[in-house]
């Protein structure tokens, strides 16, 4: 990673510096996903068996994990990992429970009462990937808020291993969080199955979870077609670090690499006003890379990442808000004093001893976050992601007499005579 001096760049070069790795979906991928979706829509379970055999190399008679298999999963997971998962789930629940939205009721005028009701989405689908490694942590991050929201049915799909079984840790996470049904299905076909429903897989109202380019494309296509709602735009993982001269370069290098190892299309950025720190981070990166099992993946990600020298930390925050990172680390001496400058980020990590990896696993916050700049308008998954907000209003005879003239004036100004008539008829019955 080379050091770039922000002040030496013109406007076009600055924009180019903040450009993320090209995320254009190849026409071939888009067409392949569309074909898979259509195959599942038309063929249901039969199509799912054919696709699973072709893409996963597994012949499955049934997709659903039995209650006995779920119960047995705990015996296949090491006690230390079980304890860690239980601890993480408890912290995730504590954080998400504290932020739950309550309904409210307010009288907006004499005789006019407006309310907001909070209702769970009836049936939700969770996707837990298992590419280079089964992400049982994602099952915790999605399953806990779904349970707190009160969803009647929570469906989870995760790819089968070569023996046709789901990963035991994923099954344990599903059991810990109260997931109601689990299916060994992966890829775009799993998303299509939850969106359209099959004889085995129930139709879901909303689908959550990360995945590869096929999963992401399937979610986008099905959402754009109005078939199913999705959690948020998805994309490769990213982190932006703002650091001062006193930050620990080894810590920063470790945080950058923890994101870079996700995939070659991940992006990491370091912004600092200290040349010495950035040089030290370069050295630390080279040393730590030698010890990583996924070093080659991390190197590819670092090749399209940036070390950006800024004149002031204020400028660093302006750049960060423009970039809107998924993860933002403030490696500063008084990080909380700078928090008011953060306007767009998925999740923020304060100080030298809050690595992003804590948020990935067990601090309690959710790691399913907006990427690709979507943090300017989207938030990470929360309990409210699994709920609907329903508005209610009730006007008495005196209430419509109180506000009816306002409605008549507005309706007539918009030329909507039927709207005006619906109010006027009622006002005519008020003594």
Curated annotation (Swiss-Prot):
Matching SUPFAM superfamilies: ALDH-like (SSF53720)
Domain of life: Bacteria
An example Gene Ontology CC term for this record: cytosol
Binding site for substrate: 237, 259, 262, 327, 360, 414, 419
Gene Ontology biological-process entries: L-histidine biosynthetic process
Catalytic residues (UniProt): 326-327
A molecular-function term among this protein's GO annotations: zinc ion binding
Cofactor comment: Binds 1 zinc ion per subunit.
Enzyme class: oxidoreductase
This protein's UniProt keywords: Amino-acid biosynthesis, Histidine biosynthesis, Metal-binding, NAD, Oxidoreductase, Zinc
Binding of Zn(2+), residues: 259, 262, 360, 419
A Pfam family recorded for this sequence: Histidinol_dh
NCBIfam families: hisD
Protein name as catalogued: Histidinol dehydrogenase
